[in-house]
């Protein structure tokens, strides 16, 4: 049943690359087979509940620009928002969605009321999922917006805030589990500091380790089969965030013995803020065995802010999905659009247009990446470059069969005097451009 919010807009369909219809897909054909799998099953698109339905359109210099009929803290408004959201998922053809607890329920006066409100809306969502076939990619807790979290959640100097945060995560994990969510995400927006003058770094890192262990223990207790995912970000809103990037989070997981329990949800915009390319973070996560899922967006490269715009750069998407496919593709993860409209994009249709463009961009990137993999366009040059390490002597070096002094004797005896070889960067860049 239509809410009327989207007027007479029909379900978005694939019309092919020659279409000029802004409310049609030009490249995303969910049933097209790519590398033996349907495109929908490769990409596993999800809509972010927060940016799509709760963001008011503000910025640091101005307030709300979006006037949504569900913008008030009542259960009636929360259910109207859910009606519009699931209508949107159906119109767009998105197989998944994601949410924070604070996105979907009205704020209560205490923890008990928050839990009651969340449980009520979860029951409502369960019926919506049954009616539409839309599934939950992941759930999470908002532990950063309310003023109680201004000094952190897990890393707060007040143990009562730690306890409140842990209890909130417990209820959100229960909600995610009940709705059949395939992952549970932790983003530490306030887990960091503004100044070291009032921060005990070791204590806060120990607190964060204990918190994450509690989450993993509870996952196993309730039989949740999805992945626990951490989402790295270097700063914003804190000056320095503890889950800075993939490498930092891996070190934290190793320190706490959780590298086999927790994987990462990697966002394109956060990678850029950390001074990395998106594909670097994806490749490193795959190399370390902790890749889980992605948040898809882009930043304005001039502003230096995390602007959360819809992706529109096909070459970037091609290299990103190349790393995803090279690592074996998504398991329980997917492509969540952590993207929001610009504050001047006021029309309901703009919500669809933004997602359509992003989905088309990702689809083009996926197809280019798949073709590069099929043709071994990058993998063969890479294998040739490292071929020496596959030789008998190279493998002995890696296995530790030679000591340092034995290696020195070997180099002298064989008169080894290696000469450098071209890295062929320009050729490889030109090869990529053939596909995009």
Curated annotation (Swiss-Prot):
Give the location in the cell: Cytoplasm
Catalysed reaction, written as an equation:
alpha-D-xylose = alpha-D-xylulofuranose
Binding-site list for Mg(2+): 306, 308
Q: Which cofactor does it need?
A: Mg(2+)
Q: What class of enzyme is it?
A: isomerase
What PROSITE patterns does its record include? XYLOSE_ISOMERASE (PS51415)
One GO cellular component term, please give it: cytoplasm
Keyword Magnesium part of the UniProt annotation: yes
Q: Name one GO molecular function term.
A: magnesium ion binding
GO BP terms: D-xylose metabolic process
Give the record's keywords alphabetically: Carbohydrate metabolism, Cytoplasm, Isomerase, Magnesium, Metal-binding, Xylose metabolism
Q: How is the cofactor bound?
A: Binds 2 magnesium ions per subunit.
Report the EC code(s) recorded for this entry: 5.3.1.5
Provide the family line: Belongs to the xylose isomerase family.
Q: Which PANTHER family match?
A: PTHR48408, XYLOSE ISOMERASE (PTHR48408:SF1)
Assembly with partners or alone: Homotetramer.
Protein name (record): Xylose isomerase
Organism, by scientific name, is: Rhizobium rhizogenes (strain K84 / ATCC BAA-868) (Agrobacterium radiobacter)
């Amino acid at each position: 049943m239509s809410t009327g919010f989207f007027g007479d807009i029909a379900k978005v369909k694939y019309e092919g690359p020659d279409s000029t219809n802004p409310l049609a897909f030009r490249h995303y054909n969910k049933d097209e087979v790519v590398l033996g799998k349907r495109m929908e099953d490769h990409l596993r698109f999800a809509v972010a509940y927060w940016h799509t339905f709760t963001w008011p359109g503000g910025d640091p210099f101005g307030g709300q620009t979006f006037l949504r009929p569900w913008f008030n803290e009542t259960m009636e408004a929360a259910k109207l928002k859910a009606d519009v959201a699931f209508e949107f998922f159906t119109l767009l053809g998105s197989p998944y969605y994601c949410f924070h607890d604070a996105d979907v329920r009205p704020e209560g006066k205490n923890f008990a009321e928050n839990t009651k409100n969340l449980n009520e809306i979860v029951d409502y969502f369960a019926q919506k999922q049954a009616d539409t076939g839309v599934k939950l990619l992941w759930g999470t807790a908002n532990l950063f917006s309310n003023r109680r979290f201004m000094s952190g959640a897990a890393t707060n100097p007040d143990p009562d805030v730690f306890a409140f945060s842990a209890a909130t995560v417990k209820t959100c994990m229960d909600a995610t589990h009940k709705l059949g969510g395939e992952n549970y995400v932790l983003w530490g927006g306030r887990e960091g500091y503004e100044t070291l003058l009032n921060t005990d770094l070791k204590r806060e890192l120990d607190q964060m380790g204990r918190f994450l262990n509690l989450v993993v223990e509870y996952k196993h207790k309730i039989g949740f089969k999805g992945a626990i995912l951490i989402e790295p970000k270097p700063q914003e809103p804190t000056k320095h965030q503890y889950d800075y990037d993939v490498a930092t989070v891996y070190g934290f997981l190793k320190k706490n013995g959780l590298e086999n329990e927790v994987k990462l949800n990697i966002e394109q915009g956060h990678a850029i803020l950390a001074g990395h390319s998106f594909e670097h973070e994806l490749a490193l996560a795959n190399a370390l065995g902790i890749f889980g899922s992605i948040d898809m967006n882009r930043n304005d490269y001039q502003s230096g802010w995390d602007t959360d715009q819809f992706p529109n750069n096909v070459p970037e998407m091609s290299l990103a999905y190349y790393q995803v496919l090279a690592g074996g593709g998504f398991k329980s993860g997917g492509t969540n659009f952590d993207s929001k409209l610009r504050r001047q994009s006021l029309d309901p249709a703009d919500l669809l247009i933004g997602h359509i463009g992003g989905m088309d961009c990702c689809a083009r990137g996926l197809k280019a990446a798949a073709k590069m993999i099929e043709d071994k366009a990058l993998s063969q040059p890479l294998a040739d470059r490292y071929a020496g390490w596959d030789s008998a002597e190279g493998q002995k070096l890696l296995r530790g069969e030679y000591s340092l002094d034995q290696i020195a004797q070997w180099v002298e005896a064989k008169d080894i005097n290696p000469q450098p070889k071209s890295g062929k960067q320009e050729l490889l860049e030109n090869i990529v451009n053939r596909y995009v």
